[in-house]
């Protein structure tokens, strides 16, 4: 399905994320609120306005406090997950390994990175569509990422043609959209091998060079389904929960076990996206949980990668906020949400 041109306010239209961004910019920007508060308290005109509207000063103080605390929390988050150390990326010298880059979100990621003349090695079982060629810095390597031997062979080719990879993007994924009883052992096993276990095999191949140089990045493309288990895709949810655990554990091991604090880790948790993975399903497309275009997810991921920093890319933030915190809610609420999710993923057995 062809993506629409990027439009205002977003490809997905007017969504909760768009509204939230507007509120952030208009009402929770400390660079705007602090001067307004100063004018209200320390200028003659400001005091005159406040005296006639006493509740206005209280509102400004409340918003300013919230805005400052929010920025402080974000700064602490950023400092913590980057281990309080900086790093520098020279993009024409970096080498990116991208799994599942022949189609869907991965194809868009390869395009965006290639457009910047960044070297990208795609690992996939099928080549990209030749009718829409990728930039010259993007190369395809046929590889079964569930096989450590195949990964090692592809890695040798990449090191010969591109050099040693510095960034690994674990993007490949499988989804059958079937119930627990309706899925075959082969389907479930394949899903875990691609969505979860391959992350370990790929890290074991490419991470040692990053650790030895104390430079690099591992991007884990998971899913909001990893937070909110959904009927008709329980196995998929389990694989993505495992991918999230891989990301979190790797981030801690890089500091405590490998002493490589500059190796970055990025987690991507997206909602339903218009790719072939959901062809059999009936995902929601609403204000709170819009059906995403692959370009939207790819752009958010690439933006974070180009920062050269660890981070969490959550798209959309509205549904992700609820999903990420679901297990902290009362059991009755958790169960009702999971049961409601069934109608979004109704696709046969």
Report each predicted region and the residues it spans:
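Conserved NAD(P)H cofactor-binding loop of Rossmann-fold oxidoreductase domains
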Residues: 171-178
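Residue(s) in the substrate-gating loop at a strand-loop-helix junction
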Residues: 223
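SDR active-site lid
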Residues: 255-317
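Canonical Rossmann dinucleotide-binding motif of NAD(H)/NADP(H)-dependent dehydrogenases/reductases
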Residues: 78-120
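Active-site helix of classical SDR
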Residues: 203, 239
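Active-site loop-to-helix junction immediately N-terminal to the catalytic Tyr of the SDR YXXXK motif
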Residues: 183, 229-237
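Substrate-binding pocket helix/loop in short-chain dehydrogenase/reductase
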Residues: 179-180, 184-189
């Amino acid at each position: 399905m062809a993506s629409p041109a990027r439009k205002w306010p977003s490809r997905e239209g007017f969504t909760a994320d768009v509204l939230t961004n507007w509120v952030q910019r208009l009402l929770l920007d400390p660079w705007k609120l602090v001067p307004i508060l100063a004018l209200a308290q320390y200028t003659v005109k400001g005091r005159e306005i406040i005296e006639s509207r006493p509740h206005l000063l209280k509102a400004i103080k409340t918003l300013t406090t919230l805005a400052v605390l929010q920025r402080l929390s974000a700064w602490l988050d950023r400092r913590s997950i980057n281990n309080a150390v900086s790093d520098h990326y020279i993009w024409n010298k970096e080498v990116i390994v991208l799994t599942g880059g022949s189609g869907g979100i991965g194809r868009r990621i390869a395009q965006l990175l290639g457009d910047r003349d960044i070297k990208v090695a795609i690992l996939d079982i099928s080549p990209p569509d030749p009718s829409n060629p990728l930039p010259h810095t993007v190369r395809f390597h046929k590889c079964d990422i569930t096989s450590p031997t195949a990964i090692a062979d592809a890695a040798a080719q990449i090191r010969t043609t591109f050099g040693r990879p510095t960034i690994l993007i674990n993007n490949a994924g499988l989804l059958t959209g079937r119930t627990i009883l309706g899925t075959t052992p082969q389907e479930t096993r394949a899903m875990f091998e691609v969505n979860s276990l391959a992350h370990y095999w790929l890290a074991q191949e490419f991470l040692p060079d990053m650790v030895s140089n104390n430079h690099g990045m591992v991007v884990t493309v998971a899913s909001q389904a990893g937070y909110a288990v959904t009927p008709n895709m329980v196995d998929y949810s389990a694989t993505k929960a495992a991918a999230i655990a891989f990301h979190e554990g790797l981030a801690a091991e890089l500091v405590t076990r490998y002493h490589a604090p500059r190796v970055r880790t990025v987690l991507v948790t997206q909602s339903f996206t218009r790719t072939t993975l959901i062809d059999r399903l009936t995902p929601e497309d609403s204000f709170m949980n819009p059906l995403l275009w692959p370009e939207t997810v790819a752009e958010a991921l690439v933006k974070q990668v180009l920062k050269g920093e660890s981070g969490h890319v959550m798209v959309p933030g509205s549904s992700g906020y609820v999903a990420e915190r679901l297990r902290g809610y009362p059991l009755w609420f958790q169960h009702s949400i999971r049961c409601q999710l069934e109608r979004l993923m109704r696709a046969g057995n």
